[in-house]
Amino acid sequence: MARPRPATFDKVKTVAENRRARFDYFIEQTYEAGLVLTGTEVKSLRFGEGSIAEAYAEVKDEXVWLVNANIPEFSHGNRFNHEAKRPRKLLLHEREINKLHGAVAREGMTLVPLSVYFNGKGRAKVELALAKGKKTHDKRETIKERDWKREQSRILRDRG
């Protein structure tokens, strides 16, 4: 009889989120990619530090790289501490990389990180979105829809 899984395997800890990306882009498809990190970067992320607000991903040399993601230096790190905004390699299957490369090159799409998290096994992952940029009028429509939904819920709450 197999041992039951520990409760820690079911938990997902979100470290950084790019909430602005869902407003600025039409999200076509999402991918889960592994993140190649050094030891001090992992420790820094486990403390909840890190930002992907200005980050993006690019396909270069048959690999996908996360660029401009800020993982601050580990406070207790020594001389082997990492560089805060260095490009970090993302781990994807080859067919996924080829698909992303084709979409970015031909269709004018962008690769945007939506969140960085630790999965149930404790591995650092990035939720990567294949997205198309919104125009200003699209953003206005999104704001109107959001306000209308908020107003509807307010009306229903007051009524009931």
Curated annotation (Swiss-Prot):
GO terms for biological process: trans-translation. It is found in: Cytoplasm. GO terms for molecular function: RNA binding. One of its GO terms (cellular component) is cytosol. It comes from the Bacteria. Pfam families: SmpB. Keywords: Cytoplasm, RNA-binding. Coiled coil: none annotated. Residues 138-160 have a biased composition (Basic and acidic residues). Residues 135-160 are annotated as: Disordered. Its main location: cytoplasm. Belongs to the SmpB family. Required for rescue of stalled ribosomes mediated by trans-translation. Binds to transfer-messenger RNA (tmRNA), required for stable association of tmRNA with ribosomes. tmRNA and SmpB together mimic tRNA shape, replacing the anticodon stem-loop with SmpB. tmRNA is encoded by the ssrA gene; the 2 termini fold to resemble tRNA(Ala) and it encodes a 'tag peptide', a short internal open reading frame. During trans-translation Ala-aminoacylated tmRNA acts like a tRNA, entering the A-site of stalled ribosomes, displacing the stalled mRNA. This is SsrA-binding protein. It comes from Sphingomonas elodea. The lineage of its organism: Bacteria, Pseudomonadati, Pseudomonadota, Alphaproteobacteria, Sphingomonadales.
